[in-house]
From Swiss-Prot:
GO molecular function: antiporter activity; proton transmembrane transporter activity
UniProt-listed InterPro entries: CemA (IPR004282)
Name the UniProt record assigns to this protein: Potassium/proton antiporter CemA
PANTHER family attached to this UniProt entry: CHLOROPLAST ENVELOPE MEMBRANE PROTEIN (PTHR33650:SF2), CHLOROPLAST ENVELOPE MEMBRANE PROTEIN-RELATED (PTHR33650)
Keywords for this protein: Antiport, Chloroplast, Hydrogen ion transport, Ion transport, Membrane, Plastid, Plastid inner membrane, Potassium, Potassium transport, Transmembrane, Transmembrane helix, Transport
Disulfide bond positions: none
TM annotation in the entry: 44-64, 330-350, 368-388, 405-425
Reactions mediated catalytically: K(+)(in) + H(+)(out) = K(+)(out) + H(+)(in)
Compartmental location: Plastid, Chloroplast inner membrane
Family per similarity comment: Belongs to the CemA family.
Protein's membrane topology: Multi-pass membrane protein
Amino acid sequence: MQEKIGLIPRSILRTLDRFRKQLFPNQETKTITLQEFQVSRQQMQVSVVTFLTLVLVPLGVNICGKTFLVKPFTQFLWNNYQTELFLNQFQAQRAFTEMQEIEDVLFFDSLIQNTNFCFNCSKAWNNYFVMQPSSYSSNSNFVIQKPDLANSQSKNSTCHNSKLILQKNVFEIYKFSENTDFFKDKMYGEQIHDGVKNSYNEFSSKASNALSNLEAPLYLGSEASLPPKLKNFDSRIFTANQLNRDDKLIYMSLQEQPLVKKQNFLDKYQFAKHETQENVINKPEIYKIEGLLQTSEKDEMELRQDKLVALAIQYNEESIDAISNLIGDALTCITITFLFFGLKVQILILQSFLTESFYSLSNANRSLIIIIVTDLLVGYHSPQGWKLLTQLILQHYGFPETKLFILCFIGTFPVILDTIFKYWIFRHLNRISPTTVLTYHRMIE
């Protein structure tokens, strides 16, 4: 049956009829309006409940499952049935880099704490000197010099402000405050190049005329008065052989200028006993210093071991967390799948509510939202964000951070998303709201 065509279009008649009902509502109009409001309210309530269900239920399953089931089981298997610490070589590389940073920090702290090399002793020492390396290498020369004598030298001397620094010397000599109880034990001779209990570096001494203008012998730690002035003597220069960064220097106490003689063909020297004085090294006090050195080195070693053990525990927990994240997220995906099958009607209502809310916006607002989303996901600056996101996901699941995989993912996945957006704009948005598409293209241009 063919419908009659009137003089006035039907759309105008329907608009006038709707306008009349709003101006002069009857009981039927009020009932329809109330029903529409109730339907809209119920739709919003169902949409909110469905959205919260889709978010909170999988999140709760993930947290509770990993905390009470997955992680304890994974931790038990990982710590008892295998010996590996890392899941992949990239995780091991990060651990080794952090380990090197810890070593650098500990070495820097040791340089700051041991500036004066005073063994952390509360007593100050009188007329005794400590050689502190600032930037040394093997076969570095250093000269033992008394500050009292250094202050009395001429301007041509190499002594300045109670310090002695030669051209090839990287050591500085310091004087401590007065205390006469430190070296009060009887002193007796000991060969320097043999060391004490084989705990110190081998030292050799040789004659040098580097300080021939001095008028008194090089002299350490005497509790008596200065010896008679001598002229034209040779200063004593000690050379530390095979000196490493962690080595400590011998703390020596010399009371008189000892004579030096060659011991054998290996050019090793030893101090010969003086006719009037036999004291060269205070052996009991050297033992005390040896104990302090061993204690200091033991503390440093224990601190280093504690740091490394904490680092190993951290990366072991990271491996366990990665496996737990993989299993827990798999449970989350299964939960979401069941929710989608069980809440089909509610999800349709939620979809209708979101669509209606989106299309109720103005054309400019819709275009702005589309531009923000597309620029974040497939914009010109998005590759760095995708790279960071990919690395975080791989670390989250303990997968190797292969550069080839990351580059391939960044080069393909944003392109696929861009194609999907363009298809949606052309297929659906252009049919539902052509003005929005026009506004979108104008804003891009």
